[in-house]
Structures are given as structure tokens and as C-alpha cells.
Design a protein with these regions (language model features):
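Positively charged, small/polar-rich N-terminal and surface patches that mediate targeting and assembly
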Residues: 1-99
Length: 99
């Protein structure tokens, strides 16, 4: 079976912003995403969004070009204003046409 290398971008964001982020991922070129409820604590042990729904973990498998667009969007429109975590992992996928 042929496998292709792609990037898995994982973003943990306040639930109130999840739909906006999901839309931005699509605009950036992501073909899909998975969103799940998440909870935890960051380096400051602060949870600003407990009242309005907690956090959501949004993940998408993308190519390098789409990843760059997503990271630029996060850096410009999210990181300066919101409590958000983001990391990128190298993954291998089957059915590459889906990503």
C-alpha cells in the first residue's frame, strides 16, 4: 500500500471560536477536519472559557502549502487575541486524494 507524508495540524481553541476556525481551515484549503471537545489547563492554569463551553480540539491533515496558509492565519488573527494551542505532527496517510 502506498502511503504519503502529510502534516497533522492540531489546534485547541475556545469552543466559542470553533466554527470560525473550522471555516478558516476550509478557506485555507483543508479538505476536512475533526473537532472534539477538550479540557485541560495551560501554563497559566487559566481557563477563560469555562463559562461558554470549554475548549475544542480541531485537527486536519493537510499538505505543506495548506499548512503554511493555516499557520499564517493563526499567527495573524488568533494568537494575539485568544488562548490557543497549536502543534504540527508528521503523519503518513493512505488514500492521499482525501487530503
Amino acid at each position: 500500500m502506498i502511503m504519503k507524508q502529510r502534516k497533522l495540524v492540531t489546534i485547541v481553541i475556545e469552543a466559542a471560536l470553533a466554527r470560525r476556525l473550522e471555516s478558516d481551515l476550509r478557506i485555507a484549503g483543508a479538505k476536512g477536519f475533526t473537532s472534539t471537545l477538550a479540557h485541560g489547563a495551560g501554563p497559566r492554569d487559566q481557563r477563560a472559557s469555562e463559562v461558554d463551553g470549554g475548549n475544542v480540539r480541531v485537527e486536519s491533515v493537510v499538505n505543506n502549502e495548506v499548512l503554511e496558509v493555516i499557520l499564517e492565519k493563526l499567527e495573524r488573527d488568533y494568537f494575539p487575541f485568544y488562548a490557543i494551542s497549536c502543534w504540527v505532527s508528521q503523519v503518513e496517510v493512505v488514500r492521499d486524494e482525501r487530503y
